[in-house]
């Protein structure tokens, strides 16, 4: 009888080394970094003339990336003699970078720094004890950060320039279902490009460019992303149709929730997503269904990240199922 052995990732069917995969992910993020600095730094400074506004995006991005490296080093230095090489191979800064681009520009910097440090430290310590990685560190960090914001200062994606020109944050309007106010803020194209209040470095148009690049470089689990986005698109569109909402409002919901960014850089995270084609598709569908429940129906601002964490629990079963199917096809 043939045995099925499931190992820890990353599992991307490519001849690329892991460090090259992470390098490609960083390259895909570069346009978003530039966008974040321009829209939430340079443009804001040109209107407010406040030098602090100019450097806010840069500080948030750099410090979040650095604290990822520091946490990786501290948690791994005792057991790994080649920790510096390991950090370089894993591109440890990517966790903090991906998290930072998803945050409000005016978030107190200490919140993501503390959370990112603790999440990476806990991840490394736990993974060494059980020899596997149970949860998506990016999703966990974002879940904790948004949970803290939700119960303290509240979640608001407006930068200081937008605060003077726009009364309401589109993200909160979507949670309340205020379609009329959303149409006043911008057209569908504005939401797609990112020319509205949104996360620090999220532009769905630029994310899709990065996604295409990653597919070409075979550095992303595209089945996870596509099945996740398609599931959400179909369900959100159907719910909107039942409610009599305009089709464009359904699309705006997807863009405001930053679902495209989450689908490309969070849900399909290299180490914490399934390893076979069928399990990748099923995983994306599960995350999509859970996201509908927590984010749309229950209106939890951190619902999508909670969905990813819960879906992580199904990965071993999905991989086992996918491996069995693959084995049958092989026989």
What are these regions (language model features)?
Residues 131-210:
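Long hydrophobic alpha-helical segments that form multi-pass transmembrane helix bundles
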Residues 204-205, 216-248:
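Conserved mixed alpha/beta catalytic, RNA-binding, or beta-rich assembly cores of soluble enzyme
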Residues 134-139, 251-259, 280-282, 298-309:
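Loop-to-transmembrane alpha-helix initiation sites
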Residues 1-69, 73, 327-331:
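N-terminal signal-anchor module of multipass membrane proteins
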Residues 50-66, 106-115, 191-205, 247-259:
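Structural signature of hydrophobic alpha-helical transmembrane segments
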Residues 83, 87-163:
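A generic, well-ordered mixed alpha/beta core segment in the N-terminal half of proteins
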Residues 91-101, 139-153, 231-239, 258-265, ...:
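Small-residue-rich segments of transmembrane alpha-helices in multi-pass membrane proteins
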Residues 7-12, 68-82, 120-131, 208-218, ...:
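C-terminal ends of transmembrane helices
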């Amino acid at each position: 009888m043939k045995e099925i052995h499931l190992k820890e990732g990353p599992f991307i069917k490519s001849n690329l080394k892991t460090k090259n995969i992470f390098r490609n992910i960083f390259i895909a993020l570069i346009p978003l970094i530039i966008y974040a600095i321009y829209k939430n730094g340079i443009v804001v400074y040109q209107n407010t003339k406040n030098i602090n506004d100019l450097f806010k995006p840069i500080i948030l991005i750099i410090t979040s990336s650095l604290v990822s490296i520091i946490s990786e080093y501290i948690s791994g230095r005792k057991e790994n003699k080649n920790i510096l090489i390991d950090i370089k191979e894993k591109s440890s800064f990517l966790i903090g970078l991906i998290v930072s681009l998803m945050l409000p520009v005016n978030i107190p910097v200490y919140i993501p720094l503390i959370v990112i440090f603790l999440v990476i430290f806990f991840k490394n310590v736990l993974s060494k004890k059980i020899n596997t990685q149970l949860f998506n560190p990016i999703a966990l960090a974002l879940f904790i950060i948004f949970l803290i914001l939700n119960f303290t200062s509240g979640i608001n994606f407006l930068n200081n320039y937008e605060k003077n020109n726009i009364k309401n944050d589109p993200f909160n309007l979507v949670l309340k279902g205020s379609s009329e106010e959303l149409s006043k803020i911008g057209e569908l194209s504005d939401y797609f490009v990112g020319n509205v209040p949104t996360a620090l470095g999220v532009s769905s148009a630029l994310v899709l460019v990065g996604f295409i690049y990653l597919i070409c470089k075979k550095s992303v689990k595209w089945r996870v992303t596509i099945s996740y986005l398609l599931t959400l698109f179909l369900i959100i569109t159907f719910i909107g149709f039942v409610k009599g909402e305009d089709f464009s409002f359904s699309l705006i919901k997807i863009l405001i929730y930053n679902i495209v960014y989450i689908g490309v850089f969070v849900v399909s995270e290299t180490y914490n997503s399934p390893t076979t084609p069928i399990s990748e598709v099923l995983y994306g569908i599960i995350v999509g269904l859970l996201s509908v429940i927590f984010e749309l129906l229950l209106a939890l601002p951190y619902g999508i990240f909670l969905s990813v964490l819960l879906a992580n629990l199904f990965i071993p079963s999905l991989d086992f199922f996918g491996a069995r199917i693959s084995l049958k096809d092989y026989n």
